UniProtKB/Swiss-Prot annotation:
The active site is at residues 130, 193, 512. This is C5a peptidase. Residues 33-117, 1029-1150 are annotated as: Disordered. GO terms for biological process: proteolysis. Residues 70-81 have a biased composition (Acidic residues). It is found in: Secreted, Cell wall.
Length: 1181
C-alpha cells in the first residue's frame, strides 16, 4: 500500500540517522550482552564509550512513577589524556618502574597486601570473556616473563592440542591467547569495554606511560586469555558461545574467568544445558567465574521506583544468576582519585575540590569566575564575559547552559550539583568549551566566596567523594528471577580509571568495572591457598575462597537511613582483600552451602541459624548480633533504601580450634507487622546481617547476610492488572490523558509501542477505504492507494468523534470494557491478541477461549518463557510484551467461526519462582458478525447542502461511527475525509476539499459515501448517489463487510480522478528537491548531537490541545469535515504497510526476541521523528 509523505527530507535524514545510531549501538554489544558501564542517559545503551550525561529535571506534574533523586548519576567516562598512537605491546622483559601506581594512592579494597602474598599473579592465567579488545595495548606487559605459565607460543599450542582446540592466536607474552567466539567474521567494533575490564584485572602499564600514575591491575603479572563473544544469532546461541569460551579457558589453565556482561532479568533456569554444564565444569576444576550484577537498577529502571505492592523488583539476570558464579555489585568508596581545583577561601586558606572536566581548563592558571544562577536567562550572564560561569544544575539541559555561557562570552563553565550527595556527572562537549562538574557543597562555597578566582591543578589527587560510601544507583538489585540471593559481594565501580583502545586510559562506571577487581582478588586468594592448603583439591580451594571472601566483606552502612544497605543490593558487602587474606574464620548457613542465608517465606517470628568455622589451631571467642530491617516505602513506591527495625543484643560464642559451631538467633517483628503490611500489602522482605566481632566495641570481623520474605513470595502476582480495571485509565508504565477519564494515548495509535504499555487485548482497525478496495478485487493490500492505514488498537477502545488519534475505553453498565470483535475477514476488529506487562518472570503462557458453559473452544500454542517487563527505556525492553501465539480470530478448534455471543478469553501462566501455582487473567469478549442495516434512500437540500437519511441505522451492537466519507485526489494520492452528523442527524456536505498545499478541489456527489460501523467492527457503506436515487443495495453487491465469494458485477464507482478505486493513478510519485521519491530514504545523514537530532534543530511538535483533544481554534463543527491539516499530515507521514502490531516485543522466538526488540523499537522511533508527533522534550539536567 503506497502512501504519501509530505515531510522535508532533512527531517527524514534526522530520523534515519537517529535509527542508525541506536541500531549501531545495539550491533556493537547487542541487546543486554555487555553490562552498560556508561549509562549516559535514561536509555542506557550498553556501551562503555565516553558519553555526556543529560538529566531530566523533576517534572512539575505529579505522576505514579516519579523520577528518582539521582536517576542519571551512573556515567562517568573521561578520556584521561591524549596519548601516543597505538603501538604493539612489548614482548620483552620490562624492568619494574618507580612510578607510583593508582593503587599506591587509593586502595579501598586493600589489594596490595594480598598481591604481596600471591606474587601479583605471576605464573597464573586469567581469562576475560567480553565484547571486544585492543589486543596490542601498552598495558599488556609482564615484568618478568620467565615466571609466566606459557613461556612461548609453542607452549600454548601444545596445551591447545591436548584439549582439541584448533583455533585462537598467540599475541604476545602477556596476551597468550585471543579468539573471537562470535563466529561472525567481523572485527570487534567495541574495543573499549573488554580492554577496560582487562586492565582492571591484569593491566601493567609501562613507566613510559604519559599518565601521571601507572595502571596496575589486581593481577598485573598474570597472563591473559582474551575471548570475544557477542550476540549474532540470538541469546541461546550467544550463551552456547560463551559456554565454549568457559570450557576453553578452563582447559587452558585459567585460574579465574571474568564475565562483565549480562541479560537483565533472565532466569538461570532458561539457559541452554550446554551453558549450565560449562558452569559446573569450571566449578569442578576449581576455576572461579566472576560476573557483574548488571546496571539495570531495579524494576522500572533508573527513572522509576518500584511499586510497593509488587516486591519482586530484582533484575539481576544471566549469567550472574548462576549460583556457582560470584556476582558483584557496584559501590562508590568515600575517596577517589580525581582532578582537582583550588580556591582561596575567605580566611585565605587553600581549598581543594574534586572536579570532573570535559575539555579541561588550562592547568595552574588562575581564572576569574562569576555566578550565573541556573544559566537560563540572558540576564544570568551579565558578569561572565572573560570569566568562568558558575551555574547551578537544574531546569534546562547541560548543553544549553554551556551554549548560553559561551554566547555570553564566558571562557568556561562550572556546573554544581543540586543534590547534596550526588555522584559526579560528565558534561557534554559543546564546541570544545572547557566545562567541569562539581559538588553542591563546593558550588555553594564558590558562590559565597569573596575571592572569585579558581585554579585547576595539573596532577590528580585522592579526595573525599561528595556521595560518601554509597551503593551505585545503577547497580542491579536481586533477587534473581528464579528467587535466589544475588548479588554476592560489592566492589568499587564508580569512576574507575583503566585502559581503553589505542593506548589510552579512561574512567568508566558500572558493575563491569567492579567484577574484574573481585576476579583478581579471587585469583590471588586461590593462589595463596595453593600454598596455605596444599592438600585441598582445586574445587575445595575455590569453595573456601568464595566463602572467606564473602564472610570477610564489610557490610556497607547507609548513613542517611541509619541502616545497612540491603543484602539484595550489596550482597555480603564491600570486598576486603586484606581481611580475606588474613582470615582464619568464616561463616556460612547452617548446611555449610554458602555464605548467605536464604530463609524463603517467614512469619512474624522466625530464626536465623548460621555456622561459624574456625580454621586456626586455637579456640576463638567472638561476639555476635543480628540487624533486622526491611524496605523503606515512599507513598506507594519502594524508596530503594533500607528501613531499620531493630538489632538483637550482642551474644558471646567460643569456637573450638579447627572446628565449627552453630548459633541460632530468634527474630520477632510482630510489633511492626501492621504498619509494614499497610503499604506493602502483598508482603515484604525481612533481612539483615549477622555480624561478628572479637569485641563488641571493635570493628566488624566478619558477617553473613540473610533474607526472608513475610508472605508468599512464590505466588506473588506475575501480571499487572489489565488497563480496563484501572479507574483512571493508567498503569505503571502508562499515564492516562488528563482530558478524559479512561482515555488512552493522545498521540495516536502508531505510538502504542512506545507509550501504551499495559495489560490489555489488542486488535486491528481497518479503514473502510481499504476494506472496500479489497472487496472490489485488489488482492494485494500493498497495491491499495489510500491516505488511511491499518492500525493496531486495543479491544474495547474507540476513537473520539472527529479525532481518531484519541481513544477511550467504552464500558458496559457493569463497568466491564466493551471488547467486541467481528471475525469476518475484513481486517477490522477480526481478532484479539494478548498484551501484558509482566511484573515477574513466568513460564508456560497459554491463551484459551471458553463459552458461557465453561467449555474450552480454542487453545493457543504455549509460550514457554516470559521475561518481566523490567523497564521501558527503548534500549533494553519495553513496558509490555505482545504474544503472537495468543491471537484468536474468533474460530473454534476446528477452524470454524464461533456463534455470536460472549466468550471468556483466559490467559494462563505460572511464575517461575519455587512453589508457584498457576495464575490466570480473564477478559470478556463479544463475538458478533451481524451487519448493520442502513437507510436505502436520502434527500439532499441544495440550499444548505444538508443530506437527510430516510432512517437511522439498525445494528446488533451499538453504533460506533456513522459518517459521510468523501475521497478526492490530493496530487497523486486518494485522500479521505469524514463528516460527522449534525445534532439533528443530518449531514452537511462540503462543496470542495482542501489539499495539503491549500489548494481547493471541487467535490461531486459521487465522491461521498455513507459509512456505518458498529462496536464489533461490522461496517456497511453505501454511495450517496445510490441513496439519492432511492436504490436498495443487496447484500451480495452492497458495501456490507461480509466478504463476498466473487467480485461485484457492477463497475466500481469512480473517484474525482476518473480512475477506478482499485487502480493506481498513472502519475509518477512526487519527488522532492533531492530527486528522491517521498517513500524512499535519503542516502545521506546529517550530523547529529547526542540526542539524535541535528545540532541546530529541535523536533517539531503538534500544537497544544485543549481538554477535548482538539487543536484550539481548529475544532470542526458537527456535520462539517475535519480540516485539521496537522492531523492529516501526521496520518499520511505515518502511513506504512506494517501494522503497529509489529512494534512491540513478542515471544514468537524466545532466542531472538530480545535481539529483534530494539530494531522494532527503532522502527517506531523512526516513524515518530518523521511525523513530528513524538513529543519528546529535550533531556534536562
Amino acid at each position: 500500500m503506497r502512501k504519501k509523505q509530505k515531510l522535508p527530507f532533512d527531517k527524514l535524514a534526522i530520523a534515519l540517522m537517529s535509527t542508525s545510531i541506536l541500531l549501531n549501538a545495539q550491533s556493537d554489544i547487542k541487546a543486554n550482552t555487555v553490562t552498560e558501564d556508561t549509562p549516559a542517559t535514561e536509555q542506557a545503551v550498553e556501551t562503555p564509550q565516553p558519553t555526556a550525561v543529560s538529566e531530566e529535571a523533576p517534572s512539575s506534574k505529579e505522576t505514579k512513577t516519579p523520577q528518582t533523586p539521582d536517576d542519571a548519576e551512573e556515567t562517568i567516562a573521561d578520556d584521561a589524556n591524549d596519548l601516543a598512537p597505538q603501538a604493539p605491546a612489548k614482548t620483552a622483559d620490562t624492568p619494574a618502574t618507580s612510578k607510583a601506581t593508582i593503587r599506591d594512592l587509593n586502595d579501598p579494597s586493600q589489594v596490595k597486601t594480598l598481591q604481596e602474598k600471591a606474587g601479583k599473579g605471576a605464573g597464573t592465567v586469567v581469562a576475560v570473556i567480553d565484547a571486544g579488545f585492543d589486543k596490542n595495548h601498552e598495558a599488556w606487559r609482564l615484568t618478568d616473563k620467565t615466571k609466566a605459565r606459557y613461556q612461548s607460543k609453542e607452549d600454548l599450542e601444545k596445551a591447545k592440542k591436548e584439549h582439541g582446540i584448533t583455533y585462537g592466536e598467540w599475541v604476545n607474552d602477556k596476551v597468550a591467547y585471543y579468539h573471537d567466539y562470535s563466529k561472525d567474521g567481523k572485527t570487534a567494533v567495541d574495543q573499549e569495554h573488554g580492554t577496560h575490564v582487562s586492565g582492571i584485572l591484569s593491566g601493567n602499564a609501562p613507566s613510559e606511560t604519559k599518565e601521571p600514575y601507572r595502571l596496575e591491575g589486581a593481577m598485573p603479572e598474570a597472563q591473559l586469555l582474551l575471548m570475544r563473544v557477542e550476540i549474532v544469532n540470538g541469546l541461546a546461541d550467544y550463551a552456547r558461545n560463551y559456554a565454549q569460551a568457559i570450557i576453553d579457558a578452563v582447559n587452558l589453565g585459567a585460574k579465574v574467568i571474568n564475565m562483565s556482561f549480562g541479560n537483565a532479568a533472565l532466569a538461570y533456569a532458561n539457559l541452554p544445558d550446554e551453558t549450565k554444564k560449562a558452569f559446573d565444569y569450571a566449578k569442578s576444576k576449581g576455576v572461579s567465574i566472576v560476573t557483574s550484577a548488571g546496571n539495570d537498577s531495579s524494576f522500572g529502571g533508573k527513572t522509576r521506583l518500584p511499586l510497593a505492592d509488587h516486591p519482586d523488583y530484582g533484575v539481576v539476570g544471566t549469567p550472574a544468576a548462576a549460583d556457582s558464579t560470584l556476582t558483584v555489585a557496584s559501590y562508590s568508596p568515600d575517596k577517589q582519585l580525581t582532578e582537582t581545583a583550588t580556591v582561596k577561601t575567605a580566611d585565605q586558606q587553600d581549598k581543594e575540590m574534586p572536579v570532573l572536566s570535559t575539555n579541561r581548563f588550562e592547568p595552574n592558571k588562575a581564572y576569574d569566575y562569576a555566578y550565573a544562577n541556573r544559566g537560563m536567562k540572558e540576564d544570568d550572564f551579565k558578569d561572565v564575559k572573560g570569566k568562568i560561569a558558575l551555574i547551578e544544575r537544574g531546569d534546562i539541559d547541560f548543553k544549553d547552559k554551556i551554549a548560553n555561557a559561551k554566547k555570553a562570552g564566558a571562557v568556561g563553565v562550572l556546573i554544581y550539583d543540586n543534590q547534596d550527595k550526588g555522584f559526579p556527572i560528565e558534561l557534554p562537549n559543546v564546541d570544545q568549551m572547557p566545562a567541569a562538574f562539581i559538588s553542591r557543597k563546593d558550588g555553594l562555597l564558590l558562590k559565597e566566596n569573596p575571592q572569585k578566582t579558581i585554579t585547576f591543578n595539573a596532577t590528580p589527587k585522592v579526595l573525599p567523594t561528595a556521595s560518601g560510601t554509597k551503593l551505585s544507583r545503577f547497580s542491579s538489585w536481586g533477587l534473581t528471577a528464579d528467587g535466589n540471593i544475588k548479588p554476592d559481594i560489592a566492589a568499587p565501580g564508580q569512576d574507575i580509571l583503566s585502559s581503553v583502545a589505542n593506548n589510552k586510559y579512561a574512567k568508566l562506571s558500572g558493575t563491569s568495572m567492579s567484577a574484574p577487581l573481585v576476579a583478581g582478588i579471587m585469583g590471588l586468594l586461590q593462589k595463596q591457598y595453593e600454598t596455605q592448603y596444599p592438600d585441598m583439591t582445586p574445587s575445595e580451594r575455590l569453595d573456601l575462597a568464595k566463602k572467606v571472601l564473602m564472610s570477610s566483606a564489610t557490610a556497607l552502612y547507609d548513613e542517611d537511613e541509619k541502616a545497612y544497605f540491603s543484602p539484595r543490593q550489596q550482597g555480603a558487602g564491600a570486598v576486603d582483600a586484606k581481611k580475606a587474606s588474613a582470615a582464619t574464620m568464616y561463616v556460612t548457613d547452617k548446611d555449610n552451602t554458602s555464605s548467605k542465608v536464604h530463609l524463603n517465606n517467614v512469619s512474624d517470628k522466625f530464626e536465623v541459624t548460621v555456622t561459624v568455622h574456625n580454621k586456626s589451631d586455637k579456640p576463638q571467642e567472638l561476639y555476635y548480633q543480628a540487624t533486622v530491617q526491611t524496605d523503606k516505602v515512599d507513598g506507594k513506591l519502594f524508596a530503594l533504601a533500607p528501613k531499620a527495625l531493630y538489632e538483637t543484643s550482642w551474644q558471646k560464642i567460643t569456637i573450638p580450634a579447627n572446628s565449627s559451631k552453630q548459633v541460632t538467633i530468634p527474630i520477632d517483628v510482630s510489633q511492626f507487622s501492621k504498619d509494614l503490611l499497610a503499604p506493602m500489602k502483598n508482603g515484604y522482605f525481612l533481612e539483615g546481617f549477622v555480624r561478628f566481632k572479637q569485641d563488641p566495641t571493635k570493628e566488624e570481623l566478619m558477617s553473613i547476610p540473610y533474607i526472608g520474605f513475610r508472605g508468599d513470595f512464590g505466588n506473588l502476582s506475575a501480571l499487572e492488572k489489565p488497563i480496563y480495571d484501572s479507574k483512571d485509565g493508567s498503569s505503571y508504565y502508562h499515564e492516562a490523558n488528563s482530558d478524559a477519564k479512561d482515555q488512552l494515548d493522545g498521540d495516536g495509535l502508531q505510538f502504542y509501542a512506545l507509550k501504551n504499555n499495559f495489560t490489555a487485548l489488542t486488535t486491528e482497525s481497518n479503514p473502510w477505504t481499504i476494506i472496500k478496495a479489497v472487496k472490489e478485487g485488489v488482492e494485494n493490500i500493498e497495491d491499495i492507494e489510500s491516505s488511511e492505514i491499518t492500525e493496531t488498537i486495543f479491544a474495547g477502545t474507540f476513537a473520539k468523534q472527529d479525532d481518531d488519534s484519541h481513544y477511550y475505553i467504552h464500558r458496559h453498565a457493569n463497568g466491564k470494557p466493551y471488547a467486541a470483535i467481528s471475525p469476518n475477514g475484513d481486517g477490522n476488529r477480526d481478532y484479539v491478541q494478548f498484551q501484558g506487562t509482566f511484573l515477574r518472570n513466568a513460564k508456560n503462557l497459554v491463551a484459551e477461549v471458553l463459552d458461557k458453559e465453561g467449555n474450552v473452544v480454542w487453545t493457543s500454542e504455549v509460550t514457554e518463557q516470559v521475561v518481566k517487563n523490567y523497564n521501558n527505556d527503548l534500549a533494553s525492553t519495553l513496558g509490555s510484551t505482545r504474544f503472537e501465539k495468543t491471537r484468536w480470530d474468533g474460530k473454534d478448534k476446528d477452524g470454524k467461526v464461533v456463534a455470536n455471543g460472549t466468550y471468556t478469553y483466559r490467559v494462563r501462566y505460572t511464575p517461575i519462582s519455587s512453589g508457584a501455582k498457576e495464575q490466570h487473567t480473564d477478559f470478556d469478549v463479544i463475538v458478533d458478525n451481524t451487519t448493520p442495516e442502513v437507510a436505502t434512500s436520502a434527500t439532499f437540500s441544495t440550499e444548505d447542502r444538508r443530506l437527510t437519511l430516510a432512517s437511522k441505522p439498525k445494528t446488533s451492537q451499538p453504533v460506533y461511527r456513522e459518517r459521510i466519507a468523501y475521497t478526492y485526489m490530493d496530487e497523486d494520492l486518494p485522500t479521505t475525509e469524514y463528516i460527522s452528523p449534525n445534532e439533528d442527524g443530518t449531514f452537511t456536505l462540503p462543496e470542495e476539499a482542501e489539499t495539503m498545499e491549500g489548494a481547493t478541489v471541487p467535490l461531486k456527489m459521487s465522491d461521498f459515501t455513507y459509512v456505518v460501523e458498529d462496536m464489533a467492527g461490522n461496517i456497511t457503506y453505501t454511495p450517496v448517489t445510490k441513496l439519492l436515487e432511492g436504490h436498495s443495495n443487496k447484500p451480495e453487491q452492497d458495501g456490507s463487510d461480509q466478504a463476498p465469494d466473487k467480485k461485484p458485477e457492477t463497475k466500481p464507482e469512480q473517484d474525482g480522478s476518473g480512475q477506478a478505486p482499485d487502480k493506481k493513478p498513472e502519475t509518477k510519485p512526487e519527488q522532492d528537491g533531492s530527486g528522491q521519491t517521498p517513500d524512499k530514504k535519503p542516502e545521506t545523514k546529517p550530523e547529529q548531537d547526542g540526542s539524535g537530532q541535528t545540532p541546530d534543530k529541535k523536533p517539531e511538535t503538534k500544537p497544544e490541545k485543549d481538554s477535548s483533544g482538539q487543536t484550539p481554534g481548529k475544532t470542526p463543527q458537527k456535520g462539517q469535515p475535519s480540516r485539521t491539516l496537522e492531523k492529516r499530515s501526521s496520518k499520511r507521514a505515518l502511513a506504512t504497510k506494517a501494522s503497529t502490531k509489529d512494534q512491540l516485543p513478542t515471544t514468537n522466538d524466545k532466542d531472538t526476541n530480545r535481539l529483534h526488540l530494539l530494531k522494532l523499537v527503532m522502527t517506531t522511533f523512526f516513524l515518530g521523528l518523521v511525523a513530528h508527533i513524538f513529543k519528546t522534550k529535550r533531556t534536562e539536567d
